[in-house]
Amino acid sequence: ETGMKRFKHPQDPLEVIGQGTKIADLHIPVNVNGDLALFRGLAKSIISGFGTNPEFIQQFTHGFEEYEEAVSNTGWEEITSTCGVKRHDIEKLAAAMRDSKSTIVCWAMGLTQHQNSVATIQEIVNILLLGGHIGKPGAGLCPVRGHSNVQGDRTVGINHKPSKGFLSSLRNTTGIKPPTKH
């Protein structure tokens, strides 16, 4: 799918007519509800030699030793059978993350609606922390809303509890008297 290889920012005319920004070229299909195991496999690969950021871990995290032990106690057989991805492919993805200056992980409603969604998102946070991919441009966490209109609403500042300033501006601009209680 084109969107998996290059991104064009729809509000930047130069990007829309240009080539876009290269984002990925490795597609790894995962078993249903196998995301947590895949991310645990990535953590295992990253910790065992594919590249952590020790300075970032030391300065911005806590509990690394306990996490490292939990990861090392998770066997490859359990990981690969649960996620349905070969160890080699997980390690290939871990190497790509190691070589990336900035990694961002996006997910949508499917991931958040699994029985183990919280643990899966925590594991995503952990692998980004391992490489220092939080708090810098082009890196971090990116939960994507389930419907385009929901995301678009948030992008333009619409939410279920609009600020007093927004409501005042709406009233002054349109003459509409919006409700102020929510």
Regions found by a protein language model. Give the residues of each.
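Cofactor-pocket helix-loop regions in the catalytic cores of large enzyme subunits
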Residues: 1-148, 156, 170-182
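Flexible, surface-exposed loop regions and adjacent strand-edge segments
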Residues: 157-162
